[in-house]
């Protein structure tokens, strides 16, 4: 607020105090940081699909997905009557707002909104059951002004391939996931099948890294313009620099090498757009162990012992 008041821009603002709720997102200060939750939306989703809030003696569900879904053209028809599209859209808003650990599970059920089958319905119910057991949780933000932009990017190479569905081209596609952080706070998450079919793990990882940096470079430009207009909008770390974390050595080598290699010249030029930012030092590509790769949570269904630590590192619980 003070930054805008001290600027030379003609912006009229009113101070209405601390922000406690916005678009159904509740915000609360805790000893851990700023907690963002959507209890009303979660309750609405559970009521829509008919999931009881009482777990009873049933075991706690610790992950929102257990497998990769397919088209399942010959599968059984849906049994329940709730609106599949409506529920998936609510889940999508939840995942993109305060529950980014759901992003893989929600993304894959969203692929089958036109003709969902019983297997897809069961996957949605799995997400909702997981939400029942974690309905009071959200995203905890712990700002750190010493950190600028950071990107965690990961890909699952042809993770949906299945010999029973080999005729479906989508099973050969890899999945991209990336998380963009600013000041140690998650500001954007993305999980989606890649549009092209990658020919190797390295290519899938490089495409993912390129897509992630395309998004963050736009944000970097915006913050640079904002800092130029508002003198007091300054941070210890330059706003127009970014550190990207990647766990594939081949993708790192391609990203940090100035010239194209014979083995990688087939990769579309659109995926090399960020190299000049690397060469000028605006973007740094850093190696990270797979166990610490936060984006892994959005590429595939994970077992609890892998999922839970990544969730804690990503959103604080």
Residue ranges and their predicted role:
Residues 1-42, 47-49, 132-134, 142, ...:
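Polymerase palm active-site segment centered on the conserved acidic dipeptide of motif C
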Residues 39-317:
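Divalent metal-binding acidic/histidine catalytic loops
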């Amino acid at each position: 607020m003070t930054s805008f008041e001290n600027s030379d821009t003609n912006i009229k603002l009113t101070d209405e105090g601390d922000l406690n709720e916005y678009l159904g997102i509740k915000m609360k200060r805790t000893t851990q940081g700023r907690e963002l939750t959507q209890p009303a939306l979660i309750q609405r989703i559970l009521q829509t699909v008919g999931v009881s809030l009482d777990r009873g003696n049933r075991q706690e569900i610790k992950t929102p997905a257990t497998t990769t879904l397919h088209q399942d053209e010959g599968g059984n028809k849906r049994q329940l009557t709730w609106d599949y599209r409506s529920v998936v859209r609510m889940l999508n808003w939840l995942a993109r707002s305060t529950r980014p650990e759901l992003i893989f599970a929600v993304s894959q059920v969203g692929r089958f909104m036109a003709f969902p089958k019983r297997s897809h319905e069961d996957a949605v119910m799995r997400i909702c059951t997981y939400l029942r057991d974690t309905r009071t949780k959200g995203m905890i933000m712990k700002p750190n002004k010493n950190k600028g932009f950071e990107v965690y990017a990961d890909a699952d190479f042809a993770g949906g391939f299945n010999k029973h569905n080999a005729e479906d081209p989508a099973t050969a596609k890899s999945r991209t996931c990336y998380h963009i952080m600013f000041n140690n706070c998650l500001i954007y998450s993305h999980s989606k099948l890649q549009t092209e079919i990658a020919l190797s793990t390295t290519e899938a990882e490089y495409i993912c890294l390129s897509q992630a940096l395309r998004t963050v470079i736009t944000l970097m430009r915006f913050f640079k313009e904002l800092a130029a207009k508002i003198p007091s909008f300054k941070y210890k770390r330059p706003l127009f620099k970014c550190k990207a974390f990647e766990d594939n050595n081949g993708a790192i080598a391609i990203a940090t090498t100035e010239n194209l290699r014979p083995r990688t010249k087939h990769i579309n030029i659109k995926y090399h757009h960020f190299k000049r930012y690397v060469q000028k030092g605006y973007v740094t590509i850093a190696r990270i162990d797979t166990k610490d790769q936060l984006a892994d949570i959005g590429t595939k269904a994970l077992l609890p012992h892998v999922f839970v630590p990544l969730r804690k590192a990503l959103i604080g619980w």
